[in-house]
Each structure stands twice: as structure tokens, then as C-alpha cells.
Amino acid sequence: MIFTKELEEKIRKYIDDNRELIIDFYRDLVNHEGKDGEIDNLRKTASFLKKNFELIGMSSELIEVGGGHAPIVTGVLNPKAPGKEMVFTGHYDTVFPTGTKGKNPFKTENGKAFGPGVCDMKGGIVISFFVAKALKEFGFKTCPIRLFFVGDEEANREGGNTIELIKKYASGILVAFNMENRNESGEICIARQGVCEYKITVKGVAAHPGKAFDEGRNAIEEMSHKIIALQAITPKRKNRQYSVSVDVIKGGIVTNAIPDHCEAYADVRFWNMQALEECESKMFKVCSDAILEGTETELKRMDILIPFETTENVRKAYKALKEVSDAIGGTITGSVATGGACDAAYFSSVGAKVLCQCGITGAYNHSIREYARLDSLYEGIRLFIFAAYNFKLFE
């Protein structure tokens, strides 16, 4: 374990000397707005990051993913160094449309940062960048350090090849830290649920509700039965392996016409692929049984984010990072499995050591109340500089 007073003092001085620069960079990054569909603004964010990566001596590039999605921005320090890459990853897109900063501008107050995306997950990018900057200034050349951020994590990735590129860059690495925000309770995430979107379509028979009521087959009525039955698939126990939530419904045109069409969309969460198969089988059974004779229901899988499962390599990565944190008096309190899909799943799927929720701590993601704790920003920089110097723990 490399933990010397000399290195500790060097890191402390680096953070103190760069506090103003860190906040300025944080502000600039948050002010680069962009959500799914705002390709021009997201590209500006990617270019901003690429420029800054290059300014600190990283070899950097934008990688096009297609499908109308924003590019991946990546930079590598010490590309020719021996050993495998230590990767800091995540996303630079947010859920907030351009213009949100006018209503909720970046600010720091009472030890917290506020603004669109400060917690999810631009704070994690700031940590990653200043870790790389420190390692460059310290003359660290022991292993390659890669920053790798996608621009479509908060989006439906249909038509793009982001997932294939993540898997490509994840293969053969030393370890990856997904810099999504940490909970304020301090746990590192070692598992996340997968999420799958389904479209349910009911075909009925249109008719006039006054003149031909009995001839009609109300698609909305049939859908109402389907929704209740689909919701009931969710096990009632707390440690359930999957859940079904029908969250969108569309049907009908006017009140004086029995609708022949209704569609709904369901969100399915699951801890492993076996659980998804079990859940999906029950969903198909529900949709194949017509309550109203003469109606037909179709169930179609639309999009999937696979679960981040706790492999042996994930356990090894957690043990190593926890050892570093404990040695330096850090704030990692334990490990946690949580809801909400993430790209750590694709690192894990190719056998990589990977951890999630390694970034800044905060709360109220995806809302105007979102905030991040500044002390965790500096603590994160300190933690991962030490992690880099102790790269052998992750082998």
C-alpha cells in the first residue's frame, strides 16, 4: 500500500492550490448544457472536454456513435505506459433542456453546488479530470489513465453503437470507475437493476357508442384489464427480482367513438437476465388472453439496458478501492445494490473490474433541487489519486 506523508502532502497542496480552478471548471462544464436530441449543444460539451483533456497533456478524440446521438469523448494519459488502463467513465449529457441554467444557475452555497447536472453527473467528470491533471503534474507514468464519457446515457440509444464501443474500450482494462454520483451515506455501487421498455398495443373494433354500442370492442377497456394484470405481475415481497410499471397510456380520439386502438408503455426493472425472462413470459401470457372477445393485444420489447451484476471481478475492485479509502481515512462506508440502470453493466458484461457511483455525493437528481457536496469533490480527487498510485491492488 502506497501511502506516504510526502504523497499526502503533495495531494493536499494540489487540491488547495487548485480550488478556484476546480470550481471554475465545474461552472463551465455545468454551463455547457445539453440533453438527448440537442446534438449541437452536446457536441459543444464534448469539444470543451476534449480541449481541456489536451491542455493537460492527454491524447484525446471524439468518437462518433451514429444514430443521431452525441459522440463519446475520450482522453488517455500515458498511452504507452506498461500495464492496463485505469478508466474513469460516465456521461456528459443531462436530463435538463438547454435554458435550464437561466432558471437554476450554477452556484456554490453552504458547501454545496447547485445547477443542472451538478450531481448527475458533471461532478464526477470534474473529479476525473483533476485526478488526471494531478497525475500528469506529479509525473505519474506507471499505467495508462483513460477518461471516457458518453453523450447519450440519459437517452434511448436506438440506431447508435455506443454500447458496442463501451464494450470495446472495456475489454482488457485494469479497472473502471463509473463516476455517477454516490449516495450521501457513502456506499459504492456493486450492482444495479436492468431496465427494459415494452410497448403494449390493443386492437379493438371502432363503433358509434349510441347507434352500434354492442358492435364495438373498446380498446381502452381491454387495455385497462391488461394494465391491472401487468401491474400484478410484480411480486409483493421486498427482495423481488423484477417489477412492472405501466407508466404511459394513449387511446381514443373523441368521446363519441368507441376506440379501436390503445397503446401503453411499461417499465420493467430486473436484477438479472433470468428474472427478465420469467417476468417477460408472464407479460406475454397476460397479453395473449383477451378479456373482451374480438380484441387483440401485442407486446413488444422496445429498449433494454442490461443489469450491472456483482461478478467476482466487481467484488475484487470493491475490496481494492475500500482498502485505499480505509488507509487514507476516506468516506466509503460499504457497498450497495441499487435501482436505476447504468453503463457499468457493459463493462461488467465483458469481464472488466468495474464499480459504480464513484463520483461526487449529493441528492435530488433530475430535479431543480439537485445539489452536490463540495467536500466530496475534493475527497474524490484525493481518493482516486491514491487509487492510481496503488494500481497493483486492482490487478
Regions found by a protein language model. Give the residues of each.
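Metal-dependent amide/peptide-bond hydrolase catalytic core
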Residues: 1-10, 17, 24, 55, ...
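Acidic/His- and Gly-rich active-site-bordering loop/insert found
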Residues: 2-116, 137-140
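A structural signal for isolated positions on well-ordered beta-strands in alpha/beta enzyme cores
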Residues: 61, 87, 146-148, 298
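Short glycine-aspartate micro-motif
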Residues: 85-87, 113, 174-178, 197-199, ...
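Phosphate-handling active-site elements
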Residues: 99, 109-111, 131-146, 230-240, ...
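Acidic/histidine-rich catalytic neighborhood of metal-dependent amide-processing enzymes
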Residues: 121-193, 393-395
